[in-house]
Amino acid sequence: MVLGCPGESRISPERIAGYTAAMKKYGVPLVEKPEEMIGKVDAMLIEAVDGSVHYERAKPFLEAGLPCFVDKPFACSVVDARKMIDLAAKKNVSIFSSSALRYATEVTQYFADRKHGKVLGCLTYGPASTHDRNPGLFHYGIHAVEILYTFMGPGCERVSCVHDEGADVATGHWKDGRVATVRGNRSGPSAFGFTAFAEKGIHTTAVSSRFFYRELLKKVVEMFKTGKPPLDPSVTLEIVAFIEAANRSGANHGSPEAVKA
C-alpha cells in the first residue's frame, strides 16, 4: 500500500480517525480526495463498507484504467453492479469483489478434497446484522450468500425469503433443479458454517475466521499482478441480483422473486 484516502463514511464514521492514525503510523501517505491518487498508484482497493457508494467511488479509477478490488457488498443494486462491470470491460481493466468467506479454509478444503462429487444442494449460515445503507442481506448476510454461491455456482432463477427480527432465510432455485438455502442470523450464535449435499455424501462444518481475509488478499494481489480476476464478475453480479430478489421477497411475505442479473 503506497497511498490512501480516509474519505467519509455514513455507516462507521467513528472508525475513520483510528484507521487514519494507523495508516500514518505505518508510513502510508494520505490525500484529501481519492482522485488525487490517480497517476500515483497502479491499482485501487475500494474499502467503503457502504455498498451504495461503491460505483461512484470506483468510477474515476476505472475510467483511468486502474484495476479495482471492491470490497463487499460489491453494490446494493444490480444497476450499480452492472455499471461497474460494464465500465471495467469498456476500459479493459480487471475488477473483482468477494466476501473473504469464499476463501475460508473449510470451504477451499472441501473442493480440494475432490471426493464429494457434484454439489446437489447446500445450506449456509452466518450472522446478518442489517443497516439502512446496505439493506437486508447486503450488509453482513452477504458473507453466507458468498459461501452459498461458492458451492452452487451461478444459475439461480428465483428466490423466496422469510424475514423476521431474528433472521432472514432465503431459498434459491437453480436452473438445473438444485435448491439451496442461506440463513442469516440476528439472534443466537454468530458463527459461519455450511452443509453441502453432494453425490457422494453430506458434509457439515463450521467455518473459522482465522485465515480467510489473508487468503482473500492473496487473490487481490494475484489479480493486480496478472490482470485476471479470480472470480468472473458475472458471478458477483448474480450474487447482487440474488440478494436484491431475497430482499424483495422478504418484504413481500416470502413471495417468489426472479433473480434478474
Each predicted region: which residue ranges?
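Aromatic/hydrophobic pocket-lining residues that form π-stacking "cages" and hydrophobic walls in ligand
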Residues: R57, M84, Y110, A245-A246
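Interdomain hinge/lid region at the active-site interface
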Residues: G188-K228
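N-terminal glycine-/serine-/threonine-rich beta1-alpha1-beta2 phosphate-ribose binding loop
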Residues: M1-A64, D86-K91, N252, V259
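Rossmann-like dinucleotide-binding domain that binds NAD(P)(H)
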Residues: C122-S190, S234-A241
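C-terminal helix-rich "cap/oligomerization" subdomain common to oxidoreductases
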Residues: E36, V41-A48, M223-A261
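A general structural signal for well-ordered alpha-helical segments in protein cores
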Residues: I16, V107, A144-V145, Y213, ...
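A contiguous active-site-proximal alpha/beta segment in oxidoreductase catalytic domains
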Residues: F69, F74-N134
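Short loop/edge segments at beta-strand edges and connector loops
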Residues: E32, V70, S97-S99, S160-H163
